[in-house]
Amino acid sequence: MAFANFRRILRLSTFEKRKSREYEHVRRDLDPNEVWEIVGELGDGAFGKVYKAKNKETGALAAAKVIETKSEEELEDYIVEIEILATCDHPYIVKLLGAYYHDGKLWIMIEFCPGGAVDAIMLELDRGLTEPQIQVVCRQMLEALNFLHSKRIIHRDLKAGNVLMTLEGDIRLADFGVSAKNLKTLQKRDSFIGTPYWMAPEVVMCETMKDTPYDYKADIWSLGITLIEMAQIEPPHHELNPMRVLLKIAKSDPPTLLTPSKWSVEFRDFLKIALDKNPETRPSAAQLLEHPFVSSITSNKALRELVAEAKAEVMEEIEDGRDEGEEEDAVDAASTLENHTQNSSEVSPPSLNADKPLEESPSTPLAPSQSQDSVNEPCSQPSGDRSLQTTSPPVVAPGNENGLAVPVPLRKSRPVSMDARIQVAQEKQVAEQGGDLSPAANRSQKASQSRPNSSALETLGGEKLANGSLEPPAQAAPGPSKRDSDCSSLCTSESMDYGTNLSTDLSLNKEMGSLSIKDPKLYKKTLKRTRKFVVDGVEVSITTSKIISEDEKKDEEMRFLRRQELRELRLLQKEEHRNQTQLSNKHELQLEQMHKRFEQEINAKKKFFDTELENLERQQKQQVEKMEQDHAVRRREEARRIRLEQDRDYTRFQEQLKLMKKEVKNEVEKLPRQQRKESMKQKMEEHTQKKQLLDRDFVAKQKEDLELAMKRLTTDNRREICDKERECLMKKQELLRDREAALWEMEEHQLQERHQLVKQQLKDQYFLQRHELLRKHEKEREQMQRYNQRMIEQLKVRQQQEKARLPKIQRSEGKTRMAMYKKSLHINGGGSAAEQREKIKQFSQQEEKRQKSERLQQQQKHENQMRDMLAQCESNMSELQQLQNEKCHLLVEHETQKLKALDESHNQNLKEWRDKLRPRKKALEEDLNQKKREQEMFFKLSEEAECPNPSTPSKAAKFFPYSSADAS
């Protein structure tokens, strides 16, 4: 069900799936086999094999990284690496020679580096790098990182395995498979990706918390870890599984060198400031280039010597140690050595120096110039591996009755470059150990001592004598971390007493209460390697000797298994990163589509209301125009009607005037004849004047009545139009209110919808994190089970070997004790032969009982060991389960906090939006009221303008004055 939900989260619709796209630096139209010829295999990476290829035309060599890609999405995962390689032209970064995608395989052709990776060189030479070599590598890595960071590129996987060497002594930074190319200078990343042992603390935190992203400073931390790795062959905490390493990095102090006294103050200070857990105070690559540790480096001679040594011709010589027949010689030599143990001073058990390893007296490291020029001297290098030939750990011969075993030195061999002083030191060491050498010792003068970790001895109880110390396994440092120890016992033998040397050679069996003989197979063979090479015209010869032991094979096996585990983890990280990228792309697409939809909805709503407003305004205009037309018609008709009435009134008025004239004539005719003429003339003049006055008054009165009637009609028309415009304004404002209310409602709905989408996306993101975390936990449990099974199998094998070895040891000890007992009886000379035979018989019976008791003790010890081992395995699983539960719980808590913070942020945004909504409503109402007041003011001004002069139009293009043309 969870997997189905996971697939649903990452599922995209059909139209969202990406089509095949062309990439600038990837060719699809060419088969790489037509251009390149595979001439060999270089290695097997986490995502594909790496081949050595040769250009068919130019003959140039390249490293071909061939990756099978099943889809375009997988192909896109590697495009970042190709783009980074194509855009980074730097002398210390590998160059891209071409990229091809053909037949479902991606071919990435990069520059071929014959020197190989630094970690492979260290394994080949079986030692870490010297400080001058580390300085040159560090300087060149810093220059490469400074260039990358200036291009806004984070490497994210710095380690010795990704630092390649050329024959010219320069490095090439490689493997940009998990690198990030930012778009902005201050951009940060939150992907949990990289190799755990080299991860910065801020990157580790991104496994469960994405709130603390990291930037290019993470590469500086990885650089510091890489320098420690080059000094000690292995990175810090390499003995832990990746799960514990992440916890260790996050909670512990920054790692340091195991033996700081061997290294310079500048190196230690450089590591201190580079391994700063606070990325804000951690320096950048440009700042570290000014550090005294690397600022004065101008020559790469140290790296040229390193590459020449790694690529030099090797002459190997395997020398056999004691064979089984030599055991009898060792038994015969017991009588000779017995005198030594009796005559010399009493030797206490080797617990006096049990807590002090051989590195207790390390040689002082020399300056870089001195160490480079002293190849042939035994202790000239801090690592002590370039030219050391020392005495091998002595083989333990059978001991005396007190249970003390006597050391028998192995053969000693002299290196090609040894001078006479080393021989004197060896002779002096033998002289200090005292006594005569046994014949077995005289026959083994060619073997040389191996590295301290290779000479670790095991007791029957599984305890180790590492570097000459009797320490329990929990306190003993891991083997690979001791590979850079001093020049073994050659430089320190003169200051060590006999008791210390003896403690190196003996194996203490605490439960049996006696010292047991070591397994002869442990020192069966010695491998001597002689390397001859030329640097700057000077021929250098370096001889190293190493005892081949089972521990060597175990170390190699553990290294291989750890690489396998890291490869599995890298695959999980890559898949997780791909899923995270797909989910992020899906979320971005969802947000983009949602924003587009929101914008479309808002635009559609605005368009709807704009259309309504346009329709309303158009209707208003049409209605007003129609009303104006009606009003004009009404004015003309009213003016015509009034004119007709006034004409009739004027006609009647004229008739009345005529009647008045007749009456005046009648009155004059009634006068006497002599007065008529004069009176007629006078009356007629008066009548004419009165007629004119009355006519003028009548016409003026008619005109005034007409204008008043027209004014009333115009006022009525204007009032009617004003009412209509008020009505339309109210409708328009109501429509505007509806428009804004709809937009506000949509905004609130969109806020809610966006919050729900972001919340669901956050849940999907954490669901994916939980899914990937559970997959990682399942892989970690699987690795832990394999580790526990290996430990149990190794314990069973060791117990089987001890069980098979015990009878041989008992027989050898029995012979020795019987011989010594017979010799003591012979010396004492007491009793008859029968009594001596009886004593020998009793002694033999006691020996049988003692041996039987030892076998029972061994069986009981093996049972206890197995029980403890099973308990330890169960404890490992329980601890792992607890750590995984804590991570899951932390992830759930963080998800809860993020969801809560998201809800609070949404509520706050909603509150702020509502708070801003009130002023918006108020501003809208004020704007609408202002428009209403402006309209009323316009109408009022129109009325006032019409009052003093009725003939003046109140509103242009809407109200027209009365004119004589209206009446016609």
From Swiss-Prot:
Q: Which residues form the Protein kinase domain?
A: 36-294
List of residues that carry Phosphothreonine: T952
Against SUPFAM superfamilies, the record matches this protein to: Protein kinase-like (PK-like)
Which CDD domains does the protein's record reference?
A: STKc_STK10 (cd06644)
Which parts of the sequence are annotated with region: Activation segment?
175-224
Q: Where is this region: Disordered?
A: 337-411, 425-490, 668-690, 827-865, 910-929, 944-968
SMART domains assigned to the protein according to its UniProt record, in alphabetical order: S_TKc
Q: Which GO terms describe its molecular function?
A: ATP binding; identical protein binding; protein homodimerization activity; protein serine kinase activity; protein serine/threonine kinase activity
Q: How is it modified after translation?
A: Autophosphorylates following homodimerization, leading to activation of the protein.
Q: List, alphabetically, the InterPro entries matched.
A: Kinase-like_dom_sf, PKK, Prot_kinase_dom, Protein_kinase_ATP_BS, Ser/Thr_kinase_AS, STE20_Ser/Thr_Kinases, STK10_STKc
Where is ATP annotated to bind? Answer: L42, G43, D44, G45, A46, F47, G48, K49, V50, K65
Tell me the superkingdom of the source: Eukaryota
Give the record's disease field: Testicular germ cell tumor: A common malignancy in males representing 95% of all testicular neoplasms. TGCTs have various pathologic subtypes including: unclassified intratubular germ cell neoplasia, seminoma (including cases with syncytiotrophoblastic cells), spermatocytic seminoma, embryonal carcinoma, yolk sac tumor, choriocarcinoma, and teratoma.
Q: What is the role of this chain?
A: Serine/threonine-protein kinase involved in regulation of lymphocyte migration. Phosphorylates MSN, and possibly PLK1. Involved in regulation of lymphocyte migration by mediating phosphorylation of ERM proteins such as MSN. Acts as a negative regulator of MAP3K1/MEKK1. May also act as a cell cycle regulator by acting as a polo kinase kinase: mediates phosphorylation of PLK1 in vitro; however such data require additional evidences in vivo.
Q: Which family does it belong to?
A: Belongs to the protein kinase superfamily. STE Ser/Thr protein kinase family. STE20 subfamily.
Entry protein name: Serine/threonine-protein kinase 10
Q: What are the top taxonomic ranks of the organism? A: Eukaryota, Metazoa, Chordata, Craniata, Vertebrata
